[in-house]
């Protein structure tokens, strides 16, 4: 699966598989001034709600729980990345995202969920 994703051009790739940097950046500049992270989604959602309140904008309500497929336990993630070739493919395909959103972390820290 990952080999196909990695070898498919952005133009032909489903939007759900595109690197986020292709969607959120223009000329390598991040356009939104707030981007939540999956790892801190509850906290980020609260921060977004507070910002909307301060600006007098409508609240979004509770964070929707759509497409939830697993619990918050991600201890099995390192098992998926034991193969250095797989790590290479991911970092090549999604390297801009890793740099943009996790530039202060090493690949190993990301794999371990740190």
PLM feature segments, named:
Residues 1-80:
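PAPS-dependent sulfotransferase catalytic domain
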Residues 25-26, 58-114:
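PAPS-dependent sulfotransferase catalytic core
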């Amino acid at each position: 699966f990952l080999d196909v994703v990695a070898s498919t051009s952005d133009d032909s790739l489903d939007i759900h598989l595109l690197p986020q940097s292709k969607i959120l950046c223009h000329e390598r500049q991040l356009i939104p001034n707030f981007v939540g992270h999956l790892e801190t989604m509850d906290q980020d959602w609260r921060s977004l709600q507070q910002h909307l309140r301060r600006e007098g904008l409508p609240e979004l309500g509770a964070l929707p729980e759509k497409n939830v497929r697993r619990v918050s336990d991600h201890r099995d993630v390192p098992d998926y990345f034991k193969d250095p070739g797989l790590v290479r493919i991911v970092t090549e395909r999604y390297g801009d995202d890793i740099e943009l959103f996790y530039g202060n972390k090493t690949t190993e820290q990301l794999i371990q969920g740190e």
